[in-house]
Amino acid sequence: MRVVAGELRGRRIEAPPGLDTRPTTDMVREATFNALNSLDLVRDARVADLFAGSGALGIEAISRGAADCTFIERDRTAFRTLRDNVAALGLDDRSKIVPGDAMVLGGSLDVDIVLADPPYDFDRWPDLLAATKASFVA
């Protein structure tokens, strides 16, 4: 998996081992960020990547000009991969990596954009949207 566009374009992002985490595909990330960029929302934005997994969404946001990203991930294996990806890409100064439940921690964040790609069986979208203080949720 690679960063699709921006300053980190083409750089590799590792996926967590196993089948518990399914990273957001390049095609989905490209479509998401094309839509966000068409609204001029990403540049200098404060972003949260909930259910972060590998961190692909938040890393893509930073690559495309977001000021910073707070990543929230509760799975220990995915958290380690996320931490390693952020370090390997030199994004420590623009990233905050928080271990924990996105549903609990996500509502307390002061950000402009919330990016969320939860597990397939996630059924709490209304709760997540109600708890989020961001201007835009994708």
Stretches with model-predicted labels:
Residues 1-138:
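Class I S-adenosyl-L-methionine-dependent methyltransferase catalytic core
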